[in-house]
Amino acid sequence: FFMQILYHFPKVVTNNFRKKYDVIPWRNNEEEFKKWCNGETGYPMVDAGMRELNKTGYMHNRVRMITAGFLCKHLLIDWRWGEAYFAEKLLDYELSANNGNWQWAAGTGCDAAPYFRVFNPESQLKKFDKDLKYIKKWIEDFDELTYPNPMVEHKFARERAISTYKKALN
C-alpha cells in the first residue's frame, strides 16, 4: 500500500501527505528527542522499545506505533525526526513503510490515525505486556518502584497535542 502511495505521491518523502497538516507547530525539543532516542522517557514501554531498536535494529510493530505516537503526540516532535532515526537504525527499513507508518502515527498521512488518537503508554503496557516480560528483557534493571518519572504526564501531553492540532487546523 505505502509503496503505491510513494510511487504516485513522491512528495511524501519530505512532506505531509495531507497538506493541511503543514501548519502544525512542532515543538522539536532536541533534549527531549535525545531522551526518546535513548529510551529515557520514563515510560517503560517506550523506553524498552527504543532500547531494543538501538541494540538490535528491530522493534515489534505495536511498539513502533507506541514509540512513534509518543514522539509525535506526547512530545510534539516532527514525525520526520523519528522517521530519520528509524531509517538509520532499523535493519528491516523500507522507505515507503517507514514513511507511511510515521505519517500514520503523526496523523498527517493518507490513512492516518486521527489527531485526537493519542496512545496512553501505560495502558498499552497493561494491555500488551502485563507480565512485564518485554520490559524486563530490554530494561535489565527495571524496578517499578524506582523507575524514573515520565518526562511528560500523559493527560497533559494528550490535551496539549489535541489542542495544538485543533488550533492549527482551524
Regions found by a protein language model. Give the residues of each.
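C-terminal catalytic domain of photolyase/cryptochrome flavoproteins
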Residues: 1-170
